[in-house]
Amino acid sequence: MQMKAMTTNYQGDSVFNTRLLSYLNRKPKNVHHIQSSVYLITFEKGHPMILKGFDSFEKWDRQRELTSLLKQKGFHQTYYIHQNLMPFQFKGKWYGSMDYFPPSKKKFRFSNHKDRLEGIQLLESFHDVSEHISIKAPVFNQSKKWKERLSLFKKNFSYVRQYVSEDIINEWIRWGEWSLEGFDKNQSLWNKEEKVIIHGDCAHHNFLRRADGTLTLIDFDLMANAPRCIDYLQYANRISHHLEDAATELWEVPQLQRYQSDLAFLYALTYPTDIFREWNRLNKSSSQLHSVWKMSVEGFSERMEMYEKLAKRISSLNRN
C-alpha cells in the first residue's frame, strides 16, 4: 500500500495534532497516514509505532488484553498494544498505539502454496494458545450473519441486475438458501468443538510477513468466542479461488482434513459469502465494480462446478 507521508506540521486537524502530541509526550519525527484511522509514527530516537483508531474504548481494551495474554502464554507472532499509554478520543475513535513491524518485500499471498500452508499453521498456533485464554469477547453466530448478508443481497437485487443477468443472480441466491438450510440442520455438530478466541477476519492482509521473514497475525477487530472451525472456514473460502480443484484440494491442507466429512462445514463452503459481501459493499461504493463483476460472472462456471462437487459429497454422506 502506498503511504502518504505527513509531518507533524502537516495541514491536518489541529485538535488531532494537539491530542497526539499530548498522548506521545514527545515530538514525532514523522506521521505517515497508512489508511483510514491508521498511522505510522517515527521518532528521532526510539522505535517507530503504529497508531490505530478503535471504534470504542472496549474494543481497544479487549485487544490490549488479548495481545498481552498471548505474549504471556508464548505466542509472539503478533503485535503488542502499548499498555502504558492510555488511548485518546477523537471524532468517535479511540486511538491507541502498538508495535510496528517493518514488512518484508515478499508479501504473504494466498496464491502461493507455501504461504497458504504457513498461514493456516499460524492460525492453528494462535488457536492452541487462545483456547486457554479467558477473555470477554462477542459470541460469533455464523448463521445469523449469513442470513443477514443474504437478505441484504436480495434487497440489492435491482442494483445487481444492472450488471449481472437475473439467471446468474438467482443461482447465487439458490445456493445461498440451500447452504443455509443444510448448515442450520447440521451446525450442532460444531458445539462439540472447544471454543477458542477466533481471529474472525482471515483476509490475506491480516497475515503480515515481517522483514525478518516471520509471519505475524494482525488486526483482531473481529475477534470472537467460537469454535476454531469458523476461522478455518473463512480461510478455506479465501484460498479456494486459488486452487484448480478446490472441492478436492482443500482436504490436502492438514488443518482442514478433519472437516471433509463434516456436513456443516461442507454446506458452509457452498454459501457464496464473497459474492454477497462484495455486492452489498458495492451498493455503497462502486470503486471495485469490475473485479466484483468478474468474480460473479467470469468465475461463475468454475464456482458452480466446485459447489456441485461439494453437493455430491454431502449427498453421499447423507446416505450413509
Q: What would you call each of these model-derived segments?
A:
Residues M1-R26, L289-N320:
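Regulatory N- and C-terminal appendages and interdomain linkers associated
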Residues G12-E44, F57:
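ATP-binding glycine-rich phosphate-binding loop
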Residues S36-F43, I50, E181-I230:
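Active-site acidic catalytic loop and adjacent metal/ATP-binding pocket
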Residues E44-I133:
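ATP-binding pocket architecture of kinase catalytic cores
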Residues Y95-R109, H132, S151-Y159, F276-S287:
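A glycine-centered beta->alpha junction motif in the catalytic cores
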Residues H113-D167:
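A cross-family kinase active-site recognition segment
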Residues F153-H199, K309-N320:
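An alpha-helical support segment within catalytic cores of ATP-dependent transferases
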Residues I230-S287, E298-M306:
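Active-site activation/catalytic loop segments of kinase-like enzymes and analogous catalytic loops
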